Amino acid sequence: MHGCSAGACACAASRPAVPVCTIGHSNRTIDDFIGLLRQNGITCLLDIRTVPKSRHNPQFGQDQLAKSLAGAGIEYRYLRGLGGLRRPRKDSQNAGWRNTSFRGYADYMQSEEFAANVDAVIELAASRTCALMCAEAVPWRCHRSLVADALLVRGIPVDDIIDARQRRPHKLTSFAHVEGLSITYPPGPQAG
């Protein structure tokens, strides 16, 4: 079993004092991206892409990104265990997601592997100002919004960095069903 159970996290004593952020690299220049991280006080970037490279934006390939961030004094960590591109299970409890990628990721969220990786984010964020990064510019089109939901139910505040003018608190997905630390997305009138 992972460190969190019965609504309380074993790492509660080391909860982050500041929100964990989410950000998408999109097609930004590396200078603009680093500027956005600095503007938001990010000291550690957590890469949650399944494939940590970009054909169209090579500045966000894992090696080049890590080098650029190191030059700016920002730590880089790759968290493969939070990567997207998951397939839905036939017996999915997450049929509220019409998007099969989100449904597959929501199914993965029920696993011990996912829980352990979320616990790792919480541990890292206890001593660093972290941002979860994927490729999509906006969080509502990216699996990082589901990771943010998982952090919220563990009592960890999350802010979504949209651009230089917008940083806003993440809100739990409207059709999420929460039981303790478990989140499902059942079908219903508000389903996505």
Name each model-derived stretch:
Residues 1-192:
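Residues lining hydrophobic/aromatic ligand-binding pockets adjacent to catalytic sites
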